[in-house]
Regions:
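Sec/Tat signal peptide C-region and signal peptidase I cleavage site
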Residues: 15-19
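Sec-dependent N-terminal signal peptides
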Residues: 3-13
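Non-catalytic cap/lid and distal C-terminal segments of serine-dependent acyl enzymes
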Residues: 20-284
Length: 284
């Protein structure tokens, strides 16, 4: 057998390592810190990818959930997926591919903020590649945009702006900076005013609040007669059991609701996954 040159051998080993799941804590295939070079921008796009158990291109196409992180940029994919897999095991939701874009802290998921281009990177560069390489659907009726905190604001924004790409948006503890009338708002979403009728008919919205609030945005949705599902996490600490992610690690006698693990655990987490499944039009 011919010996491979050292560089070629190293490349082969590296490629194989990158293609393999890097966690045994999940039922599906969990690939963290993958990179893809954008064909439009040339940017290196970092992301975490989750493929459901027994994923294969012959079962294509797979519904998709894009999960946007908060302002700090922390990767909460493992905790979110543990909640999803528990719901999947109990039959509340079916198979989904997940993508967790990384390293967009402070951008509110807008091109140009902090010198980043998350809209172009994810929607125009990464998603087409995932469709090709991992049999991800291009059908908007099988796509959900979901996020936590700043990512929740991003999901509200992307859901309305990119109606051709997503049919469901899930916002987990967004703050109060969302407005469809104020261009100076941190999360300015004029599409809710300019595309009202289309949004009324074709966008499924779920808002889940923990420590923060979206009262003004909820009032706007009501004024515009845009339907949405709303859930507030329990306010009494007695509703959270020992070991809950909704309790402070430093002082378990205090609540800590503003974190993705808390926002996706418990009965409210199950209702979120059920909401996504209910609004995903699967091909039979």
């Amino acid at each position: 057998m011919k010996a491979l040159p050292i560089i070629a051998l190293f490349s082969l080993i590296l490629s194989d390592t990158q293609a393999q799941p890097n966690s045994t804590n999940h039922q599906g295939k969990y690939h963290k810190n993958l990179t893809y070079k954008g064909h439009i921008t040339g940017d290196e796009i970092t992301y975490t990818l989750y493929l459901p158990p027994e994923h294969t291109k012959t079962k294509a196409p797979y519904p998709l959930i894009v999960f946007l992180h908060g302002a700090g940029g922390g990767n909460s994919s493992s905790q979110v997926l543990m909640s999803y897999e528990a719901a999947r095991k109990s039959g509340k939701i079916g198979d989904f591919v997940f993508v967790f874009p990384e390293k967009y802290g402070g951008t509110v998921w807008r091109d140009g903020a902090k010198g980043k281009r998350p809209e172009t990177n994810i929607l125009k560069e990464l998603l087409p590649n995932l469709e090709k390489e991992y049999a991800v659907t291009d059908n908007r009726n099988q796509r959900t945009i979901m996020g936590f905190s700043m990512g929740a604001a991003g999901s509200i924004y992307w859901g309305a702006k990119y109606l051709s790409l997503f049919s469901t948006t899930v916002s987990l503890d967004a703050g109060g900076g969302t407005s469809f009338t104020d261009p100076k708002a941190r999360n300015y979403v004029p599409e809710y005013g300019t595309k009202t009728k289309t949004i009324q008919k074709s966008l499924n919205i779920r808002l889940v609040q923990g420590a923060l609030n979206t009262r003004n945005f909820q009032q706007s949705l009501g004024m515009l007669k845009i339907d949405y599902e709303y859930e507030q996490l329990p306010r009494e600490i007695s509703n959270y059991t020992t070991g809950s992610s909704c309790l402070s690690r430093k002082d378990p006698t205090k609540k800590f609701l503003h974190n993705p693990a808390c926002m996706t655990e418990g009965s409210w987490g199950e209702r979120t996954w059920s909401f996504i499944e209910k609004n995903t039009k699967r091909v039979k």
